[in-house]
């Protein structure tokens, strides 16, 4: 186990597991999330299959700081960037231009990507210890209720995902989703 993993509570070998294309279930603000390395197209496709999700929906990224999201974000105006950063860390996800590095599996084939700097300490610590942003989508089969516990994740996905034990936050609803270009609230 690395010093970062032991200090932040990550499971031994988790970073290598994600690099190899593994999918994890981990606690977030309102439920367990499924995640993977956003740079790994095979892992993204695996996650989409696990959920039975429409590949055209895209997925969002979370991180402990904006710097980890930057490789996936395209050009932003200084005003737009400032508006976005004022809302973080917190439960606001912004839809922003995607960089050319952003895999189509992450964007759902769109020119935008959804990003958030999380205020949930365990999720932020996980991103910090792994040194990367993580894909974040609710831990459930598409159309079903998201898992609220590690045990529910294990029952739902078995050995197909590695479960990170922890507590979810106190939010009852998913994050607010806002289009940065238009200011339109896509999900309240």
From Swiss-Prot:
Give UniProt keywords alphabetically.
ATP-binding, Cytoplasm, Nucleotide-binding, Nucleotidyltransferase, Transferase, tRNA processing
Principal place of residence: cytoplasm
EC number(s): the record gives 2.7.7.87
Task: List the catalytic activities from the record.
Answer: L-threonine + hydrogencarbonate + ATP = L-threonylcarbamoyladenylate + diphosphate + H2O
User: What is the top EC class of this enzyme, as a single word?
Assistant: transferase
YrdC-like domain ranges (all copies) = 8-188
Per UniProt, subcellular location reads as: Cytoplasm
Question: What SUPFAM superfamilies does this protein's entry cite?
Answer: YrdC/RibB
Q: Which GO terms describe its biological process?
A: regulation of translational fidelity; tRNA threonylcarbamoyladenosine modification
CC annotations in GO: cytoplasm
Which portions of this protein are annotated as coiled-coil regions? none
- Gene Ontology MF term list: ATP binding; double-stranded RNA binding; L-threonylcarbamoyladenylate synthase; tRNA binding
Any single Pfam family the record assigns to this protein: Sua5_yciO_yrdC
Q: Which family does it belong to?
A: Belongs to the SUA5 family. TsaC subfamily.
What this chain does, per the entry, is described as: Required for the formation of a threonylcarbamoyl group on adenosine at position 37 (t(6)A37) in tRNAs that read codons beginning with adenine. Catalyzes the conversion of L-threonine, HCO(3)(-)/CO(2) and ATP to give threonylcarbamoyl-AMP (TC-AMP) as the acyladenylate intermediate, with the release of diphosphate.
The name on file for this protein is Threonylcarbamoyl-AMP synthase
Q: Which organism is it from?
A: Thiobacillus denitrificans (strain ATCC 25259 / T1)
